[in-house]
């Protein structure tokens, strides 16, 4: 999906669920890390995180669009647009939009080291020079076995 398709989807979702036009811009912002989208109060534009579209699909992404459009329409109408406001919570329920986003799984590389003497195994996120360090248990020489990618739920 590109910027033009995002804009078109945002306008369609606004008309379908809110029966109101979306008159501002919707753009992708790949720098967003822990949030699915962001409504900008001054410009009235909406920024969307493209990683949520890649990881969770279009149906979930439309839910995030509905959430951001709740902020948008309530702010334009000068009603309570913040998460804690009653108007916002009621509109979320009415259009069946999520209140919070799921976290995107993060990819972490783990490096595995083993002691030549005692065979103890170590997992570390950072690589280190095996010639400079020794086993903490027996003082033996360490060798790097390899590295593997692990997906975590933390953001």
Curated annotation (Swiss-Prot):
One cellular component term from this protein's GO annotations in UniProt: cytoplasm
Q: Which GO terms describe its molecular function?
A: zinc ion binding
GO terms (BP aspect)? response to stress
Q: What is its main location?
A: cytoplasm
Q: Where is each SprT-like domain found?
A: 7-145
| Positions of the catalytic residues | 68
**Which amino acid positions bind Zn(2+), per UniProt?**
67, 71
How the cofactor is bound: the record states:
Binds 1 zinc ion.
UniProt xrefs under InterPro entries: SprT-like_domain, SprT_Zn_ribbon, Uncharacterised_SprT-like
Keyword annotations? Cytoplasm, Metal-binding, Zinc
Q: Which cofactor does it need?
A: Zn(2+)
Compartments annotated for it: namely: Cytoplasm
The record's comment on protein family reads:
Belongs to the SprT family.
Q: NCBIfam families recorded for this chain?
A: PRK04351.1 (NF003339)
Q: What is this protein called?
A: Protein SprT-like
């Amino acid at each position: 999906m590109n910027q033009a398709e995002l804009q078109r989807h945002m306008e369609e979702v606004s008309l379908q669920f809110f029966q109101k036009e979306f008159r501002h811009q919707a753009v992708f912002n790949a720098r967003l890390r822990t949030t699915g989208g962001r409504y900008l109060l001054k410009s009235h534009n909406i920024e969307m995180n493209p990683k949520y579209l890649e990881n969770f699909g279009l149906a979930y992404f439309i839910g995030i669009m509905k959430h951001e459009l709740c902020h948008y329409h309530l702010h334009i109408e000068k009603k309570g647009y913040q998460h804690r406001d009653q108007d916002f919570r009621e509109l979320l329920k009415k259009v069946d939009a999520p209140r919070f986003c799921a976290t995107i799984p993060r990819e972490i590389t783990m490096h595995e080291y083993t002691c030549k003497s005692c065979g103890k195994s170590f997992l570390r996120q950072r690589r280190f020079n095996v010639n400079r360090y020794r086993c903490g248990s027996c003082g033996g020489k360490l060798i790097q076995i390899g590295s593997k990618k692990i997906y975590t739920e933390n953001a």
